[in-house]
Amino acid sequence: MGQSVVVLGAQWGDEGKGKIVDLLTEEIGAVVRFQGGHNAGHTLVINGKKTVLHLIPSGILRDDALCLIGNGVVISPAALIKEVSELEDAGVEVRSRLKISPAAPLIMPYHIALDQAREKAAGGKAIGTTGRGIGPAYEDKVARRGIRIADLHYPPQLEELLRTALDYHNFVLTKYLGVEAVDFQKTYDEALAFGDYVQPMKSDVAGILHDLRKQGKRVLFEGAQGALLDIDHGTYPYVTSSNTTVGGALAGTGVGADAIDYVLGIAKAYATRVGGGPFPTELDDAVGQGIRDRGAEYGASTGRPRRCGWMDIVALKRAVAINGISGLCITKLDVLDGMEKLKVCIAYEYRGKRTEYAPLDAQGWEECTPVYLEFPGWTENTHGITEWDKLPVAARAYLRALEELAGCPISIVSTGPDRDHTMVLQDPFA
């Protein structure tokens, strides 16, 4: 039987998953996306060349990797076409290697209009979505009024579905949110055209995955966002609209639990968050700004500056527990170079008591004050180091402490943005 590894974020997203997925896709059978949409931004740097992927799996830059998009992903037609075109213009063969589940829901123009109008209306209480229609598309999926890839190939059914959806959403857009209605004919024509475009890529993703496993092929499940943004397990309501945890890999592709052999959790050597929501270790000072500048902490999808803070072990332990993480990958270690001291949150003060467990709601998280353990920093340059013994003593001590505090071994350490700036301590596929 083949081996399957799930790669997912163990914080609030932006942990560097794309680079690690690309690293692990050598001699891979397939890479599959299982949740989210083009709100993800996976940045790859190979031989100094930067590529940002939002929807297509990061394995697309490997010539022999099959790339799959599962039923759990919501697809923007415009975003997919744009990304395919950009990659093909750069000489990457995409359409013969990209397979998309017919059960994947579409992000329609009215979803984008709803997302943006709601965020504007919310003002200071906005969640901080990317405004790309992800949430409203998932709403329609659950409400059973979503339009899926499969529907594009039955024009009469598509017309009926679209009229029903627009009757509902245009009422909300015009009467409640006070913005313009979305035009039926334009939306219908665009949907039909996309149906023709996507037809050659439409495939039974679940069936492909089952066959690959029988053939002994390696499969990598590529998560987007992070565990603490999970719709069920994250800092609700400041979360994304899908299951970013390991269960999403199963439901979002159509494989069983026995198909997963290893779960790799990606975490930065510090912590970041984009948008609203609780962030106990956030640094609103020169230290936080320094981390942001050195780490180039600006969103790959939105360009928004990321909130930066110290490593939060309480949050990380929760991510390890709810995902059954087998090993951790610590990224951006080099960003901490030159810092005199480092802090790690090992517990919270919550309503007068010390706790090592995170509250289950955003309000509870907001009331938490971090309890820190301090570590010496290092002055040496770790950028690009690929051997454990060549790391500064203090850097090794810091990593070993994270490993012990999180109760999970560190499998990979990343010391820079390039694929080669990595040390693999334990190969997840070994």
Curated annotation (Swiss-Prot):
It comes from the Bacteria. Keywords: Cytoplasm, GTP-binding, Ligase, Magnesium, Metal-binding, Nucleotide-binding, Purine biosynthesis. The keyword Nucleotide-binding applies. The active site is at residues 14, 42. Its EC number is 6.3.4.4. Disulfide bonds: none annotated. It holds the Pfam family Adenylsucc_synt. Mg(2+) binds at residues 14, 41. PROSITE patterns: ADENYLOSUCCIN_SYN_1, ADENYLOSUCCIN_SYN_2. Its cofactor is Mg(2+). Belongs to the adenylosuccinate synthetase family. This is Adenylosuccinate synthetase. It comes from Xanthomonas oryzae pv. oryzae (strain KACC10331 / KXO85). The lineage of its organism: Bacteria, Pseudomonadati, Pseudomonadota, Gammaproteobacteria, Lysobacterales.
